[in-house]
Amino acid sequence: MSKQEQIEQTIYQLLELLGEDPNREGLLDTPKRVAKMYLEMFNGLEEDPKDQFTAVFSEGHEEVVLVKDIPFHSMCEHHLVPFYGIAHVAYIPSKGRVTGLSKLARAVEVASRRPQLQERLTHQVAHALQDALEPEGVFVMVEAEHMCMSMRGIRKPGSKTVTTVALGKYKEDAILRRELLSMIHNK
């Protein structure tokens, strides 16, 4: 039995356990759709964010590189409901070594496509960039709304969680970090 078929069977059983009739018209294809969605939403489990940094160029650029407002969505590993928001990824190249800008967004994408915690997502992106490029500094900020806080429990829609990881010069130099935060927040 394929992975998709196993997930379909599990969703079918879940619907039954919840008191639904999985054979009624509106639910007939739901197990198949949910299985397909989960396989898509969790396809980042098959990749390493660090592997996204395949293109490295010697450009002589030694100032900050920042890609901000990278949209993402992920699934909270505690409740398997979405959280979504934006990521800001910055680094200071070492010896002028830079990567393609899309690689920063790809690292966020791969790290977010799995059952995840926002804190871990932030850490994984920062350390993938650090390990791949060995830059002078790395800073990653993730801002997200969590459906586990909006739809259930405390029910506070619109509240945002912000996580950061600072490495190298961004960890050591508060002025440099403040300058970067100003760039991030300056729309």
From Swiss-Prot:
Gene3D superfamilies: 1.10.286.10, 3.30.1130.10
EC number: 3.5.4.16
Pathway in which this enzyme or protein is active: Cofactor biosynthesis; 7,8-dihydroneopterin triphosphate biosynthesis; 7,8-dihydroneopterin triphosphate from GTP: step 1/1
Reactions the enzyme catalyzes: GTP + H2O = 7,8-dihydroneopterin 3'-triphosphate + formate + H(+)
Keywords: GTP-binding, Hydrolase, Metal-binding, Nucleotide-binding, One-carbon metabolism, Zinc
InterPro entries documented for this protein: GTP-CH-I_C/QueF, GTP-CH-I_N, GTP_CycHdrlase_I, GTP_CycHdrlase_I_CS, GTP_CycHdrlase_I_dom
Example of a GO cellular component annotation carried by this entry: cytoplasm
Gene Ontology BP annotations: one-carbon metabolic process; tetrahydrobiopterin biosynthetic process; tetrahydrofolate biosynthetic process
Positions that bind Zn(2+): 76, 79, 148
Class of enzymatic activity (EC top level): hydrolase
A Pfam family reported for this protein in Swiss-Prot or TrEMBL: GTP_cyclohydroI
GO function terms (MF aspect): GTP binding; GTP cyclohydrolase I activity; zinc ion binding
Assembly notes: Toroid-shaped homodecamer, composed of two pentamers of five dimers.
Entry similarity comment: Belongs to the GTP cyclohydrolase I family.
Protein name, UniProt field: GTP cyclohydrolase 1
